[in-house]
């Protein structure tokens, strides 16, 4: 018993050193004052959802979510909750009813988990020169995840590998035609630990200085550059192989960052125009756009600004200013919690687009403008348009989400790709500048709500999920069968498309 007691005291001491908050058991019996606080917190949460959750009004109107019944159930559960554990469950059930993967309410990480994470990632200070690449990248938050195919295309007869990590690719040799396949397992740079290690070793070869915050940012950008360049080189290999059809496997890809936008543009010879994004009428959106307006004003004040850019920046400034004006016009949708109708729209969706202010700009087109990445976010990546020029098929499933949906919708809605498989997850847009969080101290939870809604060129909200052009009725556990069906669908459709296309006259 003494050994157990000593171990417990040691853990408490370690947690204190780690700065952990005091641990309060969730199963202590609730007092009346606790239940009152929980019910008041519920009202705060509902008000916050109505003001700061971008898909709130859309979900109520599209999914016919009964907010009156939802509130009644949560309030009743909190009024009788025996302890904080039960109260947390009531909050979680209310939030889960919106079925939005980006909307969640969570308790803080357990102190033991935070302690373990700190042990793995270190204190968070500068990383000393000479640190091994693996240790440095773990400290920076990178992980070495598998980048194998989501569906086993590499097990199909006739498969010839051409590339492995970070983008596995190969050719399926067929009787009628060869089909190229490539895997994108993630659009999050932090999931490419091996690429980070390459970047770290390259840095170590030329610098003997510790890696501080600015160094970490530069390393992250280097990882992005390496990924975009590697993807382009892999596409060039596939193009040279003679395969006129490419299948892109994004099954199980839960999303990531703007990397999705850059890679999509390398896959299409067609200029891809971005769709609108809906912003919440909230100080969070206004703060972000005020920063944009300030940048544009500063750039327009340049005496050396090229004439060809001044009209573009004037137009961009006018669009931002008008969007700010609309965001400042209030729209209270909290009456929806009472079952009442509202006539205004929660979002402003006719100003900004998913790439910023401009729906399209060519690579290098704005290179002499400091604000270029603000005007068109993909310009922060050194991508090349149209590296691959053949027929394109994107294979997705119900686990394809978030940035993966941006990737697929961008290609599909511009007529550059055919979607194959299942309806995607329907996660849509996530967070800009961290999103809008709400602390719920009485239950020690934090709500995180998406602050943007990504629309498609058709006007649909990506939260509805993307429907495939070629839906496949496949057995959930039959992964090999899924791969065969996807290839067969792509091959059949590609042949039919070529047969119906007018032949070029011979010279």
Describe each region flagged by the PLM.
Residues 1-15:
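N-terminal Sec-pathway targeting helices
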Residues 371-387:
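Glycine-/acidic-rich phosphate or pyrophosphate-binding loops and their flanking alpha/beta elements
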Residues 401:
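Ligand/substrate-recognition segments at binding pockets and active sites
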Residues 376, 380-381, 459-466:
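Feature marks proteins synthesized as precursors that undergo proteolytic processing into two chains
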Residues 13-343, 359-361, 366-371, 388-394, ...:
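Flexible, low-complexity junctional segments that flank or bridge functional domains
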